Amino acid sequence: MAGKRVLVIDNGSYECRVGWSDSKEPDLRFRNVLTKPRKDRKKEAAASEGSASQTTVEQSAEIQVGNDITNIEAVRAHLKSPFERNVITNWNHQEQIFDYIFTKMGFDGQDKIDHPIILTEALANPNFCRQQMNELLFECYGIPSVSYGIDALYSWKHHQQKQKNISDALIISFGYSTTHVIPVLDGKLQLEHVRRLNVGGYHIITYLFRLMQMKYPVHLNAITISRMEKLVHEHCHIAVDYKEELVQWAQMDYYDEHIMKIQLPYNAVTATNAMLTAEQKQEKRRELAHRLLDIKKNREQEKLREDEQQLFVYNKLRQLYEQKKLDKFERALQQQQIGTLEDLDSLIATINSRIKRAQERAQSGPRPSKQQERLNKMPKPPEGMSQADWLAELQGKREKILGRKQARQQQRSEQAKRHTHAAQERMRIISSLAKNEKRRKANGEEEDDGFGMNDNDWDVYKRINRYNDDSDSDADNEKLMQFDKILNHYDANTDGNSNVPPQSAAENYQLHFGVENIRVPEVLFQPSMIGCSEAGLAELIAFVLKLFPAAEQQRLVEHVYLTGGCAQFKGLKERLIKELMEMRPFQSKFAIYESDEPTLSAWLGACVHAGEPTFGQTLTTRQDHQEHGREFFREHTASNIFYPTPKD
């Protein structure tokens, strides 16, 4: 065993990292999934005609693992994983992944793998799963020995290289499917006090995926798991005070300043028709009308030829009757599916009238179509004025009408308020009219003040009437519709809603990523957001600490260690400081440490373990496998604790 290089495999449920123990980084990193693409029936039929050896090679090449999957979204529905949560359950898939690993590491074509292996496994891994793994490694691949360990404890071992003389820690391990709170005292795992939260990176990504799908249902195909993974990895962070940040996001100024707009891919449509001038657009309409008339004329001529041929046949039948050839006449009627002589005469008369109408239409020329009639009824520019000047004049009139409509709308909104200048002026006029009494003559009769003789006198009623613009508004609406109709007909660049700024095609394919960047990772502290009834991470830490005496609690919180993929979230350390400060006694001390490389620290810690002098004593050999049982393994400081399965 001495002198042989150790192969380290960090077999994570999200990513697998493989390399030699004397390397500084893994030689192979890949997503721990595989797929079998759908077969092409034509290719399959062609392959069946080949030799048996060629078929075997093709079948082995059908399985795609890890980095060999070029487009993971195209086969997302067919992805397979050997894991169920964080425990291996599908051993056929695991064997295919091992084949991929050993092929990439240069063992292709060898009968056995003659190198010791360090392999990570789930915390409290069931004996049955370890039994299956031992059988796979020893009997299928012929390895000499294997050492099993927990990824979180390997990560802590790597952290101990920088923090010397540390034997106590509270390890918080963030996995893809689960999160564990692991207490370690005097360098030993306190397995009976470990607690698990069934929320991990998978749930965070899936939660964001569903949120964005509900927010943008028109972009379901563009919202993919891969895009959501990138958003989670690069742009999400954990809020120190979640409720306070939610209040900030409710303010429009904060929203506009911090919103992130994600541009989705789209195919830009070139608006060629909108780039045409008015004359070019009108010419296109005339060409289209001519083409339609030509098509109609050709159809009528074809129909006329058919009617003439049919009339010729029916006249021949009529001649048989006139020539007293009744037998031939009866047989001909049956062939043409005509009942009697009267039916034949009726058909001849109908076809004759149809031919006559067609000939009259051909002589009189084509009748203008409905589209042409509408074009003829459309107003034309006045004599002596160019079309461009006429359209510009109409556009100016249209803008004036829109201005009047906007002014009336503003006036209505002001009159609806009591303390505006318009409302106060209206009340002043009403009160002055009420106080103005008519003068009386000497005989007591009221003297006529002449009000109404001037048309301007009636404007006072318009000033005091809140809705005096109904008739004017109706007239303006009619003119506006007329102007829009003319402008839309002549000017291709005119839009009926030109006063509304158009939205670009790129803006229609944008995702606004705002409050989701704190809402999504918050599920670690509030699992109820995704329907999980378990306690959050802060409550879980408090529960684990209460399982120990006060002195041991203090030893644990003096070195809280964060590892795993989700430990990369910004703000996680600050949030845990806030949570620990709330749950710990007044003025008690605690410290939180983050892994320098959360996703690689487990593999690096396993490499440290391979270089220790006592590494040989932690290896489970083939002889141990045969003598102590298939589920047996040797314990060490970074491994699970072996509890033999009770015998019946």
Swiss-Prot record:
Q: Which residue stretches belong to region Disordered? A: 34-59, 357-385, 403-455
Q: Which regions are flagged for Basic and acidic residues bias?
A: 414-428
Residues annotated as coiled-coil are 277-311, 340-364
UniProt entry keywords in alphabetical sequence: Coiled coil, DNA damage, DNA recombination, DNA repair, Nucleus, Phosphoprotein, Transcription, Transcription regulation
Q: Does the keyword DNA damage apply?
A: yes
Q: Which residues form the signal peptide?
A: none
Q: Name one Pfam family in it.
A: Actin
What the entry lists under SMART domains is as follows: ACTIN
| Presence of the UniProt keyword Nucleus in the record | yes
Query: Which top-level group of life is the source organism from?
Result: Eukaryota
> Per the annotation, which location comes first and is thus the protein's main one?
nucleus
Q: Which InterPro entries match?
A: Actin, ATPase_NBD
Modified sites of kind Phosphoserine: 471, 473
Biological process (GO) annotations? chromatin remodeling; DNA recombination; DNA repair; regulation of DNA-templated transcription
List where in the cell it is found: Nucleus
- What CDD domains is this protein classified in? ASKHA_NBD_Arp5 (cd10211)
Q: Which family does it belong to?
A: Belongs to the actin family. ARP5 subfamily.
PANTHER family given in the database record:
ACTIN
Q: How does it assemble?
A: Component of the chromatin remodeling Ino80 complex.
- Function field: Proposed core component of the chromatin remodeling Ino80 complex which is involved in transcriptional regulation, DNA replication and probably DNA repair.
Protein name per UniProt: Actin-related protein 5
Q: Which organism is it from?
A: Drosophila melanogaster
